Amino acid sequence: MKGLYYITHIGNLPSILEKGIFSHGRIRSESIQNTTIYLEHLVNKRGNKYTADGENLWHYANLFFQPRNSMLLSVIRSKGKQNITVLRISNTVLQRQGVFITDGIASNKLTRIYSRSEGLEVLQAQQEMLQSDSWTSWNHSDKIRRQLMAECLVPNQVDPKDIQRFIVADRSVASSLWVRLSSSNIQKLVVASDIGSNIFTPFK
């Protein structure tokens, strides 16, 4: 596993680089300025689902094991791919206390939430699909679309030091982002999807 992934609007990067990736609950409670990319009714559903620790999903920053999923497709269609970045996060966050793992998009009623050890075992059975570069097999299956959005739920926040790189749609976006990051003295690797990653490829 190369890492975990977080999908966000490029406009959120200054806050993320300074403070980290916050849970939705913390963003609300601290009135943090944030450009939302997800549909409100889906976010609200997450407030009504709970982990074994008694916390609802708003308590967690949610990371994907496979970023090339239907959630990314949805936000690209609604916000434009030039405004979206995928952050690769070190998989060391899996060792955090209180982490949970899901076998699909967490808000779905069919999705189960597991402890870290149980969840990693469950995802072993989905490993081939989660690591696949092919979009043809899952495009017509609701079950596989759901499973491709398996999540790692990290309590409260993901620290800036755990962010490894930013993946964007093309070289133009990468060049602009690199200038912004350099001026902030942030040494992170910016990768354009058309030269260093295929995450955005299906959406060209």
PLM segments and residue spans:
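Active-site-proximal loop/hinge segments that shape catalytic or ion-binding/gating pockets
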Residues: 1-62, 70-204
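Short, conserved catalytic/metal-binding motifs centered on acidic residues
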Residues: 66
